[in-house]
């Protein structure tokens, strides 16, 4: 028989038998004799699990009395019993199993599920699929029943087995917590809780109701019951109630930490079941889905083999397989058949059924066996999820702590404390401004330091100067021809009129003023934005203080931009005075001459002058000479301006601007009567800080719980 067509119990055994850690933990129990109980002998341990091939995934045969026996222990349950073999075995069971479930329940009680997903079992099913009956059989209490949507809020059902204690219950929702003394109170209190959470109509809510039951007759298990899937809105239900319910169900079942328990009646076509379809959508491989078949007594005669194929995992394969149960029917509920009697009738039904009794022997049938299976699945799932959960809690804690740090500390209530608080805020702001000015600010991976942003504009400025020099070279012949025709006086042929040289220099120096002022404007905007970003970082949560600082930044920017602009204008006015030190100019002039003329003394192609030469020889001589001088002078002028203009911008817009801003910030401290106004915090910031503190508290408690659990496991 191929692996794909093996009966499910055999596939299950081979799948789980490799889990050495569970087998190791259970070894201490497997050698003890089975306790006396009311469970039929064939249910104490399925024949095909005997010997060395026993299924390590289940809790060993000696645990069966803990989960399968729904009869109350002999004697008064409220009185402690002597520590016999049964109690000793339960004590060992308690040490291994209960802490796992208690750990997750405690994390859920802390509200950790608001921050990350916890291991859980979620029960889903279509309306009238028998979902409520299964949960009633597991919990031993009556849950809300009726037509339409009965479960209107997610219900966390925490079952705790305590052999020596009387029944006790507790229901919690929102700010309400109520102790229950009798199982009969459960249905009424759940109805009341749902009306509080979802209103008195037929709407639904995503808020959780927690129901904790402690009893000797329940398994150790925590299950989340979700609303039944509906397709048509009735009465006063919202028109999109079906979509709302599906969205709520999907919110839970899509989590990788959730085992999906899909309840399907035997008398429907499994391929058309909405619940199984939703589970398949979020778990295509069936790794975390268990199918539960209900109502085997209502199926049509002749369809038994098809149900057998489903349970044996041959029709719609799931890696965790299927189980089949028979719960109380409506008539039995009306006749007040107890859950204990219902369990006996269920066992008798499967024992005497010609087709299904083999499923009983294989451990795939009855509610008690389902309880054992679910407890084991949940424990395995918790143990598997703990390393990932620990990492997620640590990461979420770090992230929340960092967010809280960015929100800043709480604002003091005392005026004296407010002064120190404001001093510290301004001190940190000034330090960051100083780092910007010095080019030492801390940047993230994809960010750029302020100096590098400005430097890009400075590089463009060098390009502008080079372009301007080239323009001079290109128009020399036009200027010389104009001189020859209009302005030449008594000077001899070949002599250059110095006035012509000055006119050309003045003309092209003036063309550089606008690009220089444009560069100043761009640099100013970059620097101002950097200062504003620092202000938002430190004062963003204080609207009045942030506005005050940004207004100060704007005022100082205007002041120093005007100073820088005046200095640039002054620089260019000075450049109108044609000047260069003789020793510097002579060196540059010599270098240009060497580049212009080759050793034979003929014009070189480097200046590309040939195409611009006038026809007469005097023009050639004048053109070449003035070209050499202009080229030499503009080379030296470009060097001077390439550094001088950036110097002016850096000095006024960074150094002076930053210093003035830091001094102005200290002036704010003199206005003591404005402290409270300046430190008025935005309401969303206070809310965010409170939420983050609550999250950090939850996650801290969760880490503490995990550490305690780990230390107990080690010891």
Swiss-Prot record:
Variant or mutagenesis effect after changing residue 131 to A: Loss of GTP-binding and localization to nuclear pore. Disruption of nuclear import
Keywords, in A-Z order: Antiviral defense, Cytoplasm, GTP-binding, Immunity, Innate immunity, mRNA transport, Nuclear pore complex, Nucleotide-binding, Nucleus, Protein transport, Translocation, Transport
Inducing factors: By type I and type III interferons.
The keyword Transferase appears for this protein: no
CDD domains in the record: DLP_1
Annotated region (G3 motif), positions in chain: 225-228
Region described as G4 motif: spans on this chain: 294-297
Disulfide-linked positions: none
Family annotation (InterPro entries): Dynamin, Dynamin_GTPase, Dynamin_GTPase_CS, Dynamin_N, Dynamin_stalk, G_DYNAMIN_dom, GED, GED_dom
Positions with a binding annotation for GTP: 125-132, 225-229, 294-297
Zinc keyword on record: no
Residues covered by the Dynamin-type G domain: 115-387
Function (record text): Interferon-induced dynamin-like GTPase with potent antiviral activity against human immunodeficiency virus type 1 (HIV-1). Acts by targeting the viral capsid and affects the nuclear uptake and/or stability of the HIV-1 replication complex and the subsequent chromosomal integration of the proviral DNA. Exhibits antiviral activity also against simian immunodeficiency virus (SIV-mnd). May play a role in regulating nucleocytoplasmic transport and cell-cycle progression.
Protein name: Interferon-induced GTP-binding protein Mx2
Native source organism of the sequence: Homo sapiens
Gene this protein is translated from: MX2
């Amino acid at each position: 028989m191929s692996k794909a067509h093996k009966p499910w119990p055999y596939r299950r055994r081979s799948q789980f038998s490799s889990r050495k850690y569970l087998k190791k933990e259970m070894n201490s129990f497997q050698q003890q004799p089975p306790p006396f109980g009311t469970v039929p002998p064939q249910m104490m341990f399925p024949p095909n699990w005997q010997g060395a091939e026993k299924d390590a995934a289940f809790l060993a045969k000696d645990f069966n009395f803990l989960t399968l026996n729904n009869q109350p222990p002999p004697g008064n349950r409220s009185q402690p019993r002597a520590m016999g073999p049964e109690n000793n075995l339960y004590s060992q069971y308690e040490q291994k199993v209960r802490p796992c479930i208690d750990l997750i329940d405690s994390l859920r009680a802390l509200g950790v599920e608001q921050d990350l997903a916890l291991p859980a079992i979620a029960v889903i099913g279509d309306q009238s699929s028998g979902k409520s009956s299964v949960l009633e059989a597991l919990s031993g209490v009556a849950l809300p029943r009726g037509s339409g949507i009965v479960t209107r809020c997610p219900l966390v059902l925490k079952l705790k087995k305590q052999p020596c204690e009387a029944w006790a219950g507790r229901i919690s929702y929102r700010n309400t917590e109520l102790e229950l003394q009798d199982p009969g109170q459960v249905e009424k209190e759940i109805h009341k809780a749902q009306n509080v959470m979802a209103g008195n109509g037929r709407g639904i809510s995503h808020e959780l109701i927690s129901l904790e039951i402690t009893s000797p007759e329940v398994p150790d298990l925590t299950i989340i019951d979700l609303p039944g899937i509906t397709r048509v809105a009735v009465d006063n239900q919202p028109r999109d109630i079906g979509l709302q319910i599906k969205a709520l169900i999907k919110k839970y079942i899509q989590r990788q930490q959730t085992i999906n328990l899909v309840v399907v009646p035997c008398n429907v076509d499994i391929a058309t079941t909405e619940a199984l379809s939703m589970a398949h959508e979020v778990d295509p491989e069936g790794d975390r889905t268990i199918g539960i078949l209900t109502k085997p007594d209502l199926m049509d005669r002749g369809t038994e083999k098809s149900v057998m194929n489903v349970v044996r995992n041959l029709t719609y394969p799931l890696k965790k397989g299927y189980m089949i149960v028979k719960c109380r029917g409506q008539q039995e509920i009306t006749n007040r058949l107890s859950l204990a009697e219902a369990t006996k009738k269920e066992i008798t039904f499967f024992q005497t059924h010609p087709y299904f009794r083999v499923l009983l022997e294989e451990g795939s049938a009855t509610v008690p066996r389902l309880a054992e299976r679910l407890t084991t699945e949940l424990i395995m799932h918790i143990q598997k999820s703990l390393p990932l959960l620990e990492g997620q809690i640590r990461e979420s804690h770090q992230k929340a702590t960092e967010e809280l740090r960015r929100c800043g500390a709480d604002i003091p209530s005392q005026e004296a404390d407010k002064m120190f608080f404001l001093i510290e805020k301004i001190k940190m702001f000034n330090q960051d401004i100083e780092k910007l000015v010095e080019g030492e600010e801390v940047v993230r991976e994809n960010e750029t330091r302020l100096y590098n942003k400005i430097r890009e504009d400075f590089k463009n400025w060098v390009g502008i100067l080079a372009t301007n020099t080239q323009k001079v070279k290109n128009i020399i012949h036009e200027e010389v021809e104009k001189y020859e025709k209009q302005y030449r006086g008594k000077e001899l042929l070949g002599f250059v009129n110095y006035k012509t040289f000055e006119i050309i220099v003045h003309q092209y120096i003036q063309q550089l003023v606008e690009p220089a002022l444009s560069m100043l404007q761009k640099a100013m905007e970059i620097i101002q934005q950097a200062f504003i970003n620092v202000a938002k970082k430190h004062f963003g949560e204080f609207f009045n203080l942030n506005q005050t600082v940004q207004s100060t930044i704007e005022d100082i920017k205007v002041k120093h931009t005007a100073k820088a602009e005046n200095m640039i204008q002054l620089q260019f006015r000075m450049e109108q005075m044609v000047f260069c030190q003789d020793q510097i100019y002579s060196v540059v002039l010599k270098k240009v001459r060497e580049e212009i003329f080759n050793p034979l003394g003929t014009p070189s192609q480097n200046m590309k002058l040939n195409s611009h030469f006038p026809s007469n020889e005097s023009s050639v001589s004048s053109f070449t000479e003035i070209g050499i001088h202009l080229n030499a002078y503009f080379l030296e002028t470009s060097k001077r301006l390439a550094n001088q203009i950036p110097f002016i911008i850096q000095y006024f817009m960074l150094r002076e601007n930053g210093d003035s801003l830091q001094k102005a910030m200290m002036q704010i401290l003199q206005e003591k009567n404005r402290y409270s106004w300046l430190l008025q915090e935005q309401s969303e910031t206070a809310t965010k800080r409170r939420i983050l503190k609550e999250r950090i508290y939850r996650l801290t408690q969760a880490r503490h719980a995990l550490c305690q659990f780990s230390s107990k496991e080690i010891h």
